[in-house]
Amino acid sequence: MASTYKDAGVDLDVYAESMSRLPRLMHRTFSPRVMPSDGGFAGLFRLDFPGKLFARNYEEPVLVSGTDGVGTKLKIAQTMNQHETVGIDLVAMCVNDLICTGAEPLFFLDYVAMGRDDPARLERIVQGISDGCVDGDLALLGGETAIMPDMYGTDDYDLAGFAVGVVERKRLVDGHLIAPGDVVLGLQASGLHSNGFSLVRKIIADHGHQWSDVIDELNQDTKTPETLAQVCLRPTKIYVSAIRSIQSHYRVKQVLHGIAHITGGGIEENLDRILPPGVNAEIDPNAWTPNPIFQWLQQTGDVATSEMRRVFNMGIGMAVVVNEYYAASVASQVAKAGIECSPIGRIVEGSSKVVYKEA
C-alpha cells in the first residue's frame, strides 16, 4: 500500500486550512512600514519611513533582538483548553526584554510546534500573539507552524518568539549611568507572568488541588470568582506603553538610567544585570504588596522566602532606575499609561549587587 504524509500524521489539507486563518491576524498588526510581500519567503519592513504618522529617520540606528518562550505555563493552557492568552505571554516575554535597551519595537516572528494540526486551536493561539503585537506595537511579520506528531503528544504544543527593535545609539539605555541616589521604581505585574510554572504545577499537584478550584484567598478583590487556572493564566503584562511614556516626556539620558525585565531569577538576578561597578540596588520588600497568588503559593507549598524571590517576580514585572529628582514625576507618568508604579528601592554605593533591606 502506498504511503502518504497523512498516514504519517500530517494532513496537508488541514494544514492549508490552518494557514488560511492567519493572514487577517497578521494584517491587523501592520503599519505602513510593512512592505507587501504576498507569497514571499520573508517579511519586509522599512527602517526609515517618510510618512507623516509613522515618520522615522535614524541617524545611527542600532538593531536590538530578543527571543523567548512561555515555558510550562503552556501545560495549564493545554489541560484547560484555554489558548487565547498564551500568545500574549509569548510576545510579552520577548518585547519586554527588547525595551530594556530603550528600543522601539519593530516586528515579531513566531514559531508554533504542534503534535497534530488543529486549525481552530492554532487560530486561538495566534489570535493571542496578534493581540500581544497590537499591545506591544509590533508587526507580526511572519512565522512558522510545524506539525511534528513524533515529537509532541497529540494535544501538546510549544511556542517560541523572536522580536526585533531599533534604538538610536545616543539613546541606548544600558545601565552605565546608574549612580548612588537613583531611585528604583517597580512596575506592577499582573501575576505570575511566565516564570516559575514548574514549581507552581508541583505545588498544585502535591497538595491535591485542581485547576478548576476556586480559592477564596485569590478572590478577595475580584468581582467574578476566578479558578486557579484563570489566576495562573493571566497574561504577562506588556510594558511598551509605560516605557514609551517615559521616553516621550523626558530626556532619556537625564532621567532614565536603567531598565530590567523581572523574569526567572526575580528582582535580584535581573536587576543586578544592569548595575555598573561600585553600586548596589537596595530593595525594600515592604514597599509593595505582591499579588495574592504569591502568598498563597508560598504558604501552600511551604516555600522559603529566598526561594520565592529567586523563582518569581513577586509582583514586580519591570524595574526602572531613574534620577531621584524625577522619580515621583516618572511614577505618575507611568500610572497614566495604566501601570501601577511606585518606589521599591534606591541605588547606594556597593559592589554591583541587589540586596534586600529587611525590617
UniProtKB/Swiss-Prot annotation:
EC number assigned by the record: 6.3.3.1
One Pfam short name: AIRS
Keywords per UniProt: ATP-binding, Cytoplasm, Ligase, Nucleotide-binding, Purine biosynthesis
Pathway(s) served: Purine metabolism; IMP biosynthesis via de novo pathway; 5-amino-1-(5-phospho-D-ribosyl)imidazole from N(2)-formyl-N(1)-(5-phospho-D-ribosyl)glycinamide: step 2/2
GO aspect biological process, one term: purine nucleotide biosynthetic process
Class of enzymatic activity (EC top level): ligase
Main location: cytoplasm
Subcellular compartments: Cytoplasm
GO molecular function annotation: ATP binding; phosphoribosylamine-glycine ligase activity; phosphoribosylformylglycinamidine cyclo-ligase activity
InterPro entries: PurM-like_C_dom, PurM-like_C_sf, PurM-like_N, PurM-like_N_sf, PurM_cligase
Catalytic activity of the protein: 2-formamido-N(1)-(5-O-phospho-beta-D-ribosyl)acetamidine + ATP = 5-amino-1-(5-phospho-beta-D-ribosyl)imidazole + ADP + phosphate + H(+)
GO cellular component, as recorded: cytosol
Domain of life: Bacteria
Family under the similarity heading: Belongs to the AIR synthase family.
Record NCBIfam families: purM (TIGR00878)
Protein name: Phosphoribosylformylglycinamidine cyclo-ligase
UniProt source species: Rhodopirellula baltica (strain DSM 10527 / NCIMB 13988 / SH1)
Lineage: Bacteria, Pseudomonadati, Planctomycetota, Planctomycetia, Pirellulales
